[in-house]
Amino acid sequence: MITIARPLLLALLLSCSVGHPASAAPSSRSTASDIVSEADCFSMGSYDQWMAGLRAKNGLLKSLLIRWKFPEDEFTRHRRNLDCRAITYRSDGHLVRGWLVRPKHGASTGKLPVIVYNRGGNRGYGALTFAHLFTHVFPLAESGYVVAASQYRGVMSAQDAASSPDQFGGDDVRDVTNLLRIVSRLPGSDPDNLFMLGQSRGAIMTFRALRETTLPIRAVAIYSGVYDLHDLLAMRPAFDGLFEVLIPDYRRHRKAELDKRSVTRWPGQLPPRTGVLMIHGDEDERAPLRSARTFAVELDRLGRPYKLVVHPGESHFLDGVRPEVHAQTLQWFERFRQRPGQ
């Protein structure tokens, strides 16, 4: 099914580089004990103290832009309604940073559905800051979900980046599958209602994790996803040099490594009942829309549940239709959510 949605007015893109990502560590059993440290996301104190910290780190102009985008009443509402933690968790012997956000008031059943959010970018670029949570994570948690997000390995420190580097969808996929297992076992999480959301490169992490995890994932949503690295290289040839840095044995096994990270090459290996929502802008200059359309054709051929939503006039970040994208995602997840007694 392909739906063409109408855009809203284009919103101002703000790149927020503040906050404190979480830390993490490894384990074979993936229980709550794999969270080795956690800290309150709002530990900076008041809204004014947060703004003062932003000014000191990013300068006056950027702090004013962030103040405009995230007003004090929004900060206060999230602080009142959400339990937000910067965490460090264990993943195969590595310490990995992340975020864990839950509604403070829970659900009448005592169990809440879970979303694992898979970010875009590589290494430190695209890492989720506290300010990013306002756009990407808090709205999902306010809608009644436990939301966990990984920074992926290699983001703890320069030493960590050298000893456990980002592989752009290689061994680092285990950071997602381990986080899924950890958060599904936390008190208040509903292990029967697990979902994933991937943005840009996060699509690679989402689909590889979906193929490899033993946990039942009910549905996934992908924003501006990378579905085929061959198409990405055709669109952005400079990525060839980046892949040589990030992907082990890239020059010797180039096609095999690209195929491994390209869901268009193995759609039949995905769980047949997991619903796939794809949201893309038709002016995306970073991730090719044609890959999403190719993947949609394959899912249709296989008879899999899916939906492709294309927003006219929208770029990679979908800023002009963010409320619509959020609503479309929640509607999709609700469609596949298991209710008590089902």
Regions found by a protein language model. Name each.
Residues 277-280, 284:
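Short beta-strand/loop motif that positions the catalytic acidic residue
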Residues 285-291:
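Conserved alpha/beta-hydrolase "acid-adjacent" motif
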Residues 127, 226-269:
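Mobile cap/lid helix-loop segments that gate and shape the active-site cleft of serine hydrolases
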Residues 293-342:
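C-terminal catalytic histidine-bearing segment of alpha/beta-hydrolase fold enzymes
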Residues 5, 13-82:
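N-terminal targeting or regulatory segments adjacent to alpha/beta-hydrolase or S9 domains
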Residues 166-186:
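Alpha/beta-hydrolase active-site loop
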Residues 107-112, 117-159, 229-230:
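Short substrate-entry loop that stabilizes the transition state in hydrolases
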